[in-house]
Every structure is written in structure tokens, then in C-alpha cells.
């Protein structure tokens, strides 16, 4: 059986929480498409291509993980790819409220669409890409919250020498 799901997000930047969701997703599905959303209404720190490259490097050569990007509605991307399942990570009850609304809207737009929710690891309940960006911009240490390659990319992007 070839069970696949899409794990969409902005991943700006990829965090260890995202990696935990990818790992949990691989326990549920044969294949994951990590799909980087290109949202023109946001001003990302990293370009779509940079985010895709950082994700590829962080997941290594796992043949079960494909990294892609999309514009527009995720359900349209899911329809185009023929993958009507989405994997979403939850950290808190507040995440569920938003994700529940989104899942129902997606189901309305694409009736065969299914959302699968998994909890992130307890070490990452508080971690969000937005928070990581904010802490990094103000000079805080985000080591342990992001993969090593992302930490290096953040340091380069912000013009800071790597910590030793």
C-alpha cells in the first residue's frame, strides 16, 4: 500500500518540532510530501528555495520524504498531487481550534480530503517558527530548537558568527 500525506507549512524556519512531526508522520504514512507554502502576504526570513534546501538537508536522504512547494490553496495542491491527506502538528489546545476550522473548510472544498493530527514531542510544545525567528533576531540562543543546519543558516542570515 502506498499511503502518502502532505505536511504543509511555512517552515520559516524549520524547527525541531517540525522534524518531530515529520518523524511521527513517517510512522503513519509510507511517504510524506513536506510542502512549503509560498504566501505572498507574509515577509519570510528565508526564501521558498532556501526553506526547501534546509528541510532537505535536515531530513537527509530519506526516500520517504519529498520536499516541494505550493502557491494558493493547499486543497488545490492536494488535488493536483492526488494526495487528499494532510498531516498537521498540534502543540496546544489553541492549535486545535484553528486546525479544526481549517480541516472543516478543506473538507468542504474537497470532500475526500482528510486531516490527520499528531502531537509534537513534549520538548517542543512551546516552539514555533515565529518565536524562533523573534528570539534569533534579538540575539537569543535558539540552539536545540532548530536543526544544526538551520541554526547555521539563521546565524548567516543575521550576520552573526556561529557559536562554538
Curated annotation (Swiss-Prot):
It is found in: Cytoplasm. It catalyses: (R)-4'-phosphopantetheine + ATP + H(+) = 3'-dephospho-CoA + diphosphate. Keywords: ATP-binding, Coenzyme A biosynthesis, Cytoplasm, Magnesium, Nucleotide-binding, Nucleotidyltransferase, Transferase. GO terms for biological process: coenzyme A biosynthetic process. Substrate binds at residues 10, 42, 74, 88. One of its GO terms (molecular function) is ATP binding. SUPFAM superfamilies: Nucleotidylyl transferase. Pathway: Cofactor biosynthesis; coenzyme A biosynthesis; CoA from (R)-pantothenate: step 4/5. Pfam families: CTP_transf_like (PF01467). ATP binds at residues 10-11, 18, 89-91, 99, 124-130. Belongs to the bacterial CoaD family. HAMAP family: PPAT_bact. Homohexamer. This is Phosphopantetheine adenylyltransferase. It comes from Anaeromyxobacter dehalogenans (strain 2CP-C). The lineage of its organism: Bacteria, Pseudomonadati, Myxococcota, Myxococcia, Myxococcales.
